[in-house]
A protein has these predicted regions:
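Conserved lysine of the Walker
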Residues: 22
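Conserved nucleotide-sensing/catalytic segment adjacent to the nucleotide-binding pocket
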Residues: 36, 49-97, 104
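Extreme N-terminal, non-catalytic leader segments
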Residues: 1-12
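ATP-dependent NMP and nucleoside kinases share a basic, alpha-helical "lid"
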Residues: 92-141
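P-loop (Walker A) phosphate-binding loop of NTP-binding proteins
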Residues: 17
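Short beta-strand-centered segment that lines the nucleotide-binding/catalytic pocket of NTP-utilizing
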Residues: 33-49
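Hydrophobic positions on the alpha1 helix immediately C-terminal to the Walker A/P-loop
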Residues: 25
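Small-molecule kinase domains that catalyze NTP-dependent phosphoryl transfer to phosphate-bearing small molecules
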Residues: 92, 114, 144-179
Length: 179
């Protein structure tokens, strides 16, 4: 509330691993404040971007360049966002949906605090989660084959990003949703 009272526009990043509660917290803030929420999961790489070199980069499995150009820069400038979600089923980008910048704007998702994106936020929050609780939540919300992708591929990508770029320590707040 203090930030929105002091500024005409506030951008908040909610960062953390899979199943840590990022989307839930984003939805809660949206319900309380009526603010837009933008999801890093909507910015996975298109097939032609999925190269060995790109995946070798910590945080390289999201299209942060497109996220910066299509979401963060317009929000910072107070312009509407032409939000184009990546469809994981078809590997295509959906037609744009125009979203007006709010006083409070939430970005939720792993990779939201990549150094290319972090300077655009006024506040950043990290949600830690234990490996046990993460596994329990992923198994509860996903089919076995999809859960296996999390354990074998996505969580190792996230962990490498968190470690290589010291993400947790670069966030302003750490809120445990691991209860």
């Amino acid at each position: 509330d203090r930030l929105t009272a002091e500024r005409s526009r506030v951008l908040v990043a909610i960062e953390g691993g899979s199943a840590s509660g990022k989307t839930t917290l984003g939805e809660l803030l949206q319900n309380v404040y009526g603010c837009p929420v933008f999801h890093m999961d909507d910015f996975f790489l298109r097939p032609e971007q999925r190269t060995e070199a790109r995946f070798a980069q910590p945080g390289g499995n999201v299209d942060r360049e497109r996220f910066l150009e299509e979401v963060l820069i317009p929000l910072r400038e107070g312009r509407p966002v032409d939000y184009r979600r990546f469809d994981c089923a078809t590997f295509t980008i959906a037609p744009p949906q125009r979203i007006k910048a709010g006083t409070l704007n939430i970005v939720e998702g792993a990779y939201s605090m990549h150094p290319d994106l972090a300077p655009y936020y006024d506040l950043s929050v990290f949600l830690p989660i234990s490996a046990e609780k993460q596994r329990e939540r992923i198994l509860k919300r996903n089919a076995p084959a999809h859960a296996k992708q999390f354990f074998d591929r996505w969580i190792p990508f996230e962990q490498r990003y968190f470690d290589a770029l010291d993400v947790r320590n670069r966030c302003d707040l750490i809120l445990s949703a691991d209860g």
